[in-house]
Amino acid sequence: MRVLNNVTEAIGNTHMLHLSKIADEFGVQGNIYAKMEYLNPGFSKKDRVALQMITEAENAGLLVPGQAVVELTSGNTGTGLAIACACKGYKFIVCMSKGNSMERARMMKALGAEVVLVDQMPNSVHGQVSGEDLALVEIEAQKIAKERNAFRADQFNLEACNHAHEKYTAEEMWEQLDGNIDVFVDFLGSGSTFAGCSKTLKKHNSSIKCYVVEPETAAIYSGKEITDQGHKIQGGGYSMDLPLVDKKLIDGYIQVTDEEATDVARKLAKLEGVFAGFSSGANVCAAIKLLKSSEKGKNIVLTLNDSGLKYLSTDLYEEL
């Protein structure tokens, strides 16, 4: 293994894990293959999009030495940007809802970021960030970007985010599994993982089915009634339109409850030694549901999005 010049060179090329014990536990026929994105330097898949946004902005002359970078985050993209900015010498200001777990804010501050915490809506529940909460963070990010003439690393709109998964994550999946992929599932956050991976996987094999995963109470893409935006699956399910997602790539929809995502995340830890977050549990839960129904016997690939270390202040894992 070569010596790295800086930690951004460690982003990507994550391992692929066959979740055989989980499949046995739930009695399903087929294979669940999980890309271990929580092993990136910032402990999430968002390191990829963070680096890609900075790199493409530099190449386009949109980000120059001495300029600051600003973005909103649930914690993961912000951590990735904090790492990239630390390595490249940019000032980074991050805006985050107070509803997200504070481990993330502390980590970003440790990495040199200026952290701006934004109040939730009056009717919101701590630990359950809604689209309305995120809109408040967006307002603050826009304000700071204007005041400081900062580059806005806009994870919900910049095509660079799709490119990170289109050019790298999906190609790694294809190579690691020798093309033996039938299904891809993804819990929608900003939508870039779904959009980028689906586009590339379908280019390799148009018969690969790509499913959107959403919270059961906030399944806007499947067209279901929104009954509660305040779900526990942090990092996504915001009940909002996602410009990066090409709906023509969607082959189906799966809904997951808070309890299901939590249960599967805990089982991942105890059975597979995988310490991951809520959305990873949601992805694996969706795969299990498909293997029990329409995709029985198939090979399903997904990402394990982030580390369980980011959720120690939540009820995802039991207290001592």
Where in the sequence are the language-model features?
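PLP-dependent amino-acid enzyme catalytic core
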Residues: 1-320
